[in-house]
Amino acid sequence: MKRGRLPSSSEDSDDNGSLSTTWSQNSRSQHRRSSCSRPEDRKPSEVFRTDLITAMKLHDSYQLNPDEYYVLADPWRQEWEKGVQVPVSPGTIPQPVARVVSEEKSLMFIRPKKYIVSSGSEPPELGYVDIRTLADSVCRYDLNDMDAAWLELTNEEFKEMGMPELDEYTMERVLEEFEQRCYDNMNHAIETEEGLGIEYDEYVVCDVCQSPDGEDGNEMVFCDKCNICVHQACYGILKVPEGSWLCRTCALGVQPKCLLCPKKGGAMKPTRSGTKWVHVSCALWIPEVSIGSPEKMEPITKVSHIPSSRWALVCSLCNEKFGASIQCSVKNCRTAFHVTCAFDRGLEMKTILAENDEVKFKSYCPKHSSHRKAEEGLGEGTAQENGAPECSPRDPLEPFAGLEQNREEAHRVSVRKQKLQQLEDEFYTFVNLLDVARALRLPEEVVDFLYQYWKLKRKVNFNKPLITPKKDEEDNLAKREQDVLFRRLQLFTHLRQDLERVMTDTDTL
């Protein structure tokens, strides 16, 4: 189909009268429709012109030059016959309006505080301050009246000697450096001394199984805070960490009491609730108690399964009715004693591995322990459990092996205490003047003056440190947080118990 090329619609209207007539008729019909549909008699803003489409159409036989028409290869669509939409009143068309807008000034973006995070390992961003670095840079020692008076007298001597005066901040820095170096070096010496006194002691035994032997994969591990010794398997240590190791109670900073015996300290693990603690040895030797995960040796479970008769037993060694006691394994012998009391007195406590890989625990009272040891020494084998007579709970230990062991343990403890006291009395030997002077870039004479004053002040204060160590402050803060969490846990536990009680009462009604 050919389409004619027309310069403009006005020329078509002048040259072809029929086209203008068609447009006028169409416009009148459009105006008539619009006037009928509108309540107000006004001209429409636009109409559809069909004359433009008619003027463009040419028959294929029409003779034109090739540059006067375009050939459309696309098929013709019927909706194109509706015409072209054109405006009727050009005055009603909105005129474009433009104006120059003033340049907006960019506002400074302020990052919300909740998105600001400071990490100790990463340097702070530009414009922000690392709180930890700022706290470490602040001097923790403050001068008191005595320090100020001594500083004034010392500065007068410095003037006479021709030395520069010493300011308060420098004095605080030097005294803080003395305290920090003394604390670090003394702790290292204490750990070394206590390590030599325990790890290389031939009498040291595991706190759980009381065995002094270790093997590959089941080494004996010492707590760096309370110095208890345990096997890896006995305490559930899957992998020995490099460096220091702390038991569960020391790691949490708590000193709980055992639920089953009156002994304080030792290798303890928590129950399922986490609020009560039990010695691992007590959990192993009391038959009703179990351990949730044998690999980790925690939590302690089934404490509620202990019968009331066992809770009512009185220990024959400490004479206390506290916790749950065990009884002698000899038939017809009912002597009761705590597990930890039996270990402290050196009673015979055996672990037997049965044929079906079942572990049996045998415990013997003081009388039967002495009989069995005497018979084993003479080569007569083990004692006959069925024929052994009943012993009284008040029978004393016949061979004083337990007392001798207690004396040796007390002697070792007293030796350690003497070493520790000697280290505390000689605290000033753990500070090197040259190292402090080089670290702070101060003259050795000034540091020596402060060193002598620091020694006198600590001796007057019974060798106590002048500032609290950072580690102790962190431990105190951690302990406070632990106490808060513990109180919350107790609150939630009581709340749950109350809800369960209400639910039970509701069900009964």
Swiss-Prot record:
Family of the protein in this entry: Belongs to the JADE family.
Residues of the region (Interaction with histones) are 80-188
Subcellular location as annotated: Nucleus; Chromosome; Cytoplasm; Cytoplasm, Cytoskeleton, Cilium basal body
What would be one Gene Ontology cellular-component term for the protein?
A: histone acetyltransferase complex
- Sites of the modification Phosphoserine? S89
In terms of superkingdom, the source organism counts as: Eukaryota
Modified-residue entries (Phosphothreonine), positions: T92
- Span list, region Interaction with KAT7/HBO1 and histones: 60-80
Its UniProt domain note says: The 2 PHD-type zinc fingers are required for transcriptional activity.
The record's PANTHER family line, in alphabetical order, gives: PHD FINGER PROTEINS (PTHR13793), PROTEIN JADE-1 (PTHR13793:SF79)
- Role noted for this protein: Scaffold subunit of some HBO1 complexes, which have a histone H4 acetyltransferase activity. Plays a key role in HBO1 complex by directing KAT7/HBO1 specificity towards histone H4 acetylation (H4K5ac, H4K8ac and H4K12ac), regulating DNA replication initiation, regulating DNA replication initiation. May also promote acetylation of nucleosomal histone H4 by KAT5. Promotes apoptosis. May act as a renal tumor suppressor. Negatively regulates canonical Wnt signaling; at least in part, cooperates with NPHP4 in this function.
A Gene Ontology molecular function term of the record = zinc ion binding
Where does it mainly reside? nucleus
Write the protein's name: Protein Jade-1
Region entry Disordered, spans: 1-45, 373-399
Q: In which organism is this protein found?
A: Bos taurus
> Which SMART domains is this protein grouped with?
PHD
Arranged from A to Z, the UniProt key words for this protein are:
Activator, Apoptosis, Cell projection, Chromosome, Cytoplasm, Cytoskeleton, Isopeptide bond, Metal-binding, Nucleus, Phosphoprotein, Repeat, Transcription, Transcription regulation, Ubl conjugation, Zinc, Zinc-finger
Cross-link Glycyl lysine isopeptide (Lys-Gly) (interchain with G-Cter in SUMO2) placement: K114
Query: From which residue to which do the PHD-type zinc fingers run?
Result: 203-253, 313-369
| Example of a GO biological process term | regulation of transcription by RNA polymerase II
C2HC pre-PHD-type zinc finger locations on the chain: 255-289
Subunit structure, as described in the record: Component of the HBO1 complex composed at least of ING4 or ING5, KAT7/HBO1, MEAF6, and one of JADE1, JADE2 and JADE3. Interacts with NPHP4.
